[in-house]
Amino acid sequence: MCQRKCRQQSGGVEPEQSCDTGLVNYLYEEFSMHVLFCTDGSKISFNALHNFAKWTKGAVVDVICVIDWTFLPDEVSVETEGFANSCANVADTILSFAQKEIEKTSLIFGQGIKRCGEAVDSILEQIDREKYDIVLMGSHGKKGIQRWLGSVSRDVVNNISVSSYISKYENKARKILFATDGTDNSNLAVRDAIKYLNLNEKEIYVCVVNENPSLLFLEGTLDSHWLLEIEEQQLKNADRIIRDVRSKLEEYSLPIKKDAIVMGIPAEKIIDFARDEQIDLVVMGTRQKSKIRGSVSKRVLEITAADVFIVK
């Protein structure tokens, strides 16, 4: 195996011609993933970077740092030019640290972007400006009624049409869970995880949640025989979904360590499974291209301690 090398060019990053053509093409595909890493300089945000670096096959990472001054009370006045300079200096320090952290990994530093203003709007503007495959963020994971209330990561994920990788804690990046329901969105999540992440030597788990049919209908409208038939069809469908995921993974010689079919409320069962199996990364699709408000993905993001990769 040759040493991975690349050089900066005006059109992006291109691997050096130091390997055979097949490997060069593979490396170029590997390096072509374009990621936007959003950081406020917090440990939480760098946990996301460190975890992601353990999963990725390689990516060009742009870093955006927004110094958000909008939290200041209206009665507090600042000298515009001086405050802007202070913002820029703080952002430069954070971006410099981010570049050094990226260079310690297999990731490639793209460009540093500094903004002074409202964090969510600034990040959304940058996402609209460039074509990114994944947006990478940390989440502070507030508790109780504060959970995701006013969260930058929540607002960004809820308003973008690209995939996102959200992290709260640094972890071993070893166990990955595909939470799937067999829909096109879930199938896309499996394909993109294989495409963007290095799953070799990882422990792969697959979970399908069947909703309890007795909760889907008014009490007294179903007899026990009909309920049993519905449950039997659910099991057959779940078996098919797992076989399809297994078949897709086997194309890349990726074995499943454990699969499970459980019954209950999808978000709750996914959260429970991730906790019980000490999952490091949950991969999910979402039925809605942008908004995830009220979705299973949103609920899992709120509660789980694992990283979450939401594919759109």
Model features per residue range: what roles?
Residues 1-12, 134-155, 173, 281-303:
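Glycine-rich, Arg-bearing micro-motifs that act as flexible, cationic patches
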Residues 6-25:
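Acidic, proline/serine/threonine- and glycine-rich low-complexity intrinsically disordered segments
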Residues 27-81, 175-228, 247-254, 303:
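Small/aliphatic-rich secondary-structure junction motif
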Residues 65-67, 139, 208, 285-287, ...:
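Short secondary-structure boundary segments
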Residues 151-169:
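Short, structured interface segments
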